[in-house]
Amino acid sequence: MKKLNLILLLMLSLIVFGCKKDDKPNDETTIEKLKVSVINDLHGALEEENGEYGAARLSWLVEKERQVEGQEVLLLCAGDTFQGSAVSNYSYGLNTLKVMNHMKFDAMTIGNHEFDWDLSTVLNYVDGNDSNGEADFPFLACNIIDKTTNTIPQYVKEYEVVDYGQFQVGIIGYIGSTLESDISASKVANYDFIDPVDRIGELAEELRAEKGCELVLAMGHDASSSTNIRIAGFSGNAAVDGIINAHTHTIYEDTIKNGNGDNIPLTQAGTAGEYMTEIVFNFDADQVSFDEGIAFNHDMSLYPNGVDLTVQQMVNQMTNEIAPIMNEEISTAGRYVSKSSVCNWTADAIYKSVDCDLAAINSGGIRQSAFPINEGLVVTVKKIYEIMPFDNLVKRCQVKGSDLKNILLINDAVFSSNVEIVGSSFYINGELVEDNKMYTFACVDYLFDREISIYGKGENIEILQLLVRDIMIENLKELKHNGQRWLD
């Protein structure tokens, strides 16, 4: 790796470049090793349940590493952090943020699910206003462009520099340039995700030449192999020392050769805190340089007795506060319930609850991890949050029959059961769809916004203030009131 002049580095280390120094060692501390601990796609999984191991176990492992003499820990999160669990969603991510502050995270990359409540909701946590909750760490993205200003959004940083006295570490954040399509179009309409690669090279060079960073990491909410290869291709000061991936919920601890000929770590750690990445960099104080990083993914299931009692108490208090709502028993499974059956049932629930001719959801909105559901299971509000963790609204419009036929062929759309396709013929309530007739169509907003065939050709478009999850809950309550079981 690049060798820095010791005298120059020590002079630069006296200057703070957006760093948090309170918990970092002074210049007299001898650091032999830096461990970079990373989680990605946490999705608000604070509790230990359903095969997820919880924030208390993650925090225990981080603190265990922090106690090792001669070693420092850099704690990072690669996005999709807040959205996805009852305890996190109910507070718009604030509960997760409080736990992360306690764990002393150093930086977080913005992921596609940070847009689910509008990006502005999440950015409130880095706006400097303590009254709405504030992160003790920055949110990073060098390639999200606000169309109104043609710059990165206010309160977002391109990178963070963490100062350890003997050396500085730069972390560059980015989001996959193709991930706009994974966000409801209305939530991302004011933003562009540009190709991050050139900017990462520029920032890496700036971090080394101007900020005195010996180590530079690229942390992306992305797992594009072509992007990884291009980022790794930089040499000289523009080279990075590790690439952190996210988004696909996969698990790997690979290496890739950078433009300087070094084998650098390339990692991702699954989802929901099931794994935690650890990248070890050994520091040579005489040469003021790092050896090549070595990556390892901790399987958190191997630490059943690991618990940070303070975090456990925090999470218990959070869950207890919402327990009267989340633990309400709203139905009982009348048979074995699969994901596909819930997709069909949910489309029917929207059709029943909204004045329309037909309804649809996207199958990806129902999460496979919530299944199986066995006959006799008591279904709570919390269980519906597991099944449908996203705060999707219903949209409604008028669609011409000729356009509706194309809509009915969308691959991952699940339509209400009053829709039937026989060969090349389309039926609604047993009647043939007529090309020139207008039909009222209700649809989950993600699918509605994504499909130009709907968004571009629909008329009289309405955004109904109805969450799909709330429609599911109310329909289940009605079944219970009528003495019926779910999908009996």
Regions found by a protein language model. Name each.
Residues 20-22:
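Bacterial signal peptide processing site
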Residues 26-33, 44-47, 59, 67, ...:
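Catalytic centers of hydrolytic enzymes
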Residues 25-301, 341-349, 398, 462-466:
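Acidic, metal/ion-coordinating pockets
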Residues 15-18:
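C-terminal motif of bacterial Sec signal peptides marking the signal peptidase cleavage site
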Residues 2-9:
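Sec-dependent signal peptide recognition
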